């Protein structure tokens, strides 16, 4: 009788351990999503930081909040909170090389990818740095964050 209970207990423990361990496919999926987010952020940065962009100096006057220390995927909530102001400033960057439709598509991609990466958790409270960042600094910080997380996964 005790053998059956012991075997059941072992089986349940193995199931719990197996289900709670991260699957390699989820790591691969996270890497792919981070690559996509990196690509989209770089495209935004290139559109903004283009020397031919006559509105760059005006865009640099807008300030964005960045977290004091972003080290985990949950910190992407801080990016989510700044996406709307970012999008509004990006509309200023519209030019013949950086169209409104392209900006909307990139912002939509970023929103979707960030939600996949951070999950639906919204209770995370961002601890922002005292100093604000320009749009270029803001995008560079998030690019660096993605690269850092990506390097820990490889």
Curated annotation (Swiss-Prot):
Subcellular compartments: Secreted
Entry-linked Pfam families: IL2
UniProt keyword annotation of Lipid biosynthesis present: no
Disulfide bonds: 78-126
UniProt cross-references to InterPro entries, sorted A to Z: 4_helix_cytokine-like_core, IL-2, IL-2_CS
Keywords: Adaptive immunity, Cytokine, Disulfide bond, Glycoprotein, Growth factor, Immunity, Secreted, Signal
PROSITE patterns to which the protein is assigned, alphabetical: INTERLEUKIN_2 (PS00424)
Any coiled-coil regions, as ranges: none
Biological process according to GO: activated T cell proliferation; adaptive immune response; cell surface receptor signaling pathway via STAT; extrinsic apoptotic signaling pathway in absence of ligand; interleukin-2-mediated signaling pathway; leukocyte activation involved in immune response; negative regulation of B cell apoptotic process; negative regulation of inflammatory response
Leader sequence residues: 1-20
Sites carrying sugar chains: 111
Function in brief: Cytokine produced by activated CD4-positive helper T-cells and to a lesser extend activated CD8-positive T-cells and natural killer (NK) cells that plays pivotal roles in the immune response and tolerance. Binds to a receptor complex composed of either the high-affinity trimeric IL-2R (IL2RA/CD25, IL2RB/CD122 and IL2RG/CD132) or the low-affinity dimeric IL-2R (IL2RB and IL2RG). Interaction with the receptor leads to oligomerization and conformation changes in the IL-2R subunits resulting in downstream signaling starting with phosphorylation of JAK1 and JAK3.
Protein name in UniProt: Interleukin-2
The encoding gene: IL2
């Amino acid at each position: 009788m005790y053998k059956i209970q012991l075997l059941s207990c072992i089986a349940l423990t193995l199931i719990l351990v197996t289900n709670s361990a991260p699957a390699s496919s989820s790591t691969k999926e996270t890497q792919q999503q981070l690559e996509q987010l990196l690509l989209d952020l770089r495209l935004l940065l290139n559109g903004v930081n283009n020397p031919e962009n006559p509105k760059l100096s005006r865009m640099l006057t807008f300030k964005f909040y960045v977290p004091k220390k972003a080290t985990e995927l949950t910190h992407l909530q801080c990016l989510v909170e700044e996406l709307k102001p970012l999008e509004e400033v990006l509309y200023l960057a519209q030019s013949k090389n950086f169209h409104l439709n392209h900006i909307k598509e990139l912002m939509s991609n970023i929103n979707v990818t960030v939600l996949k990466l951070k999950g639906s958790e919204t209770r995370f409270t961002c601890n922002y740095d005292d100093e604000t960042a320009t749009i270029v600094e803001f995008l560079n910080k998030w690019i660096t964050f993605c690269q850092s997380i990506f390097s820990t996964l490889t």
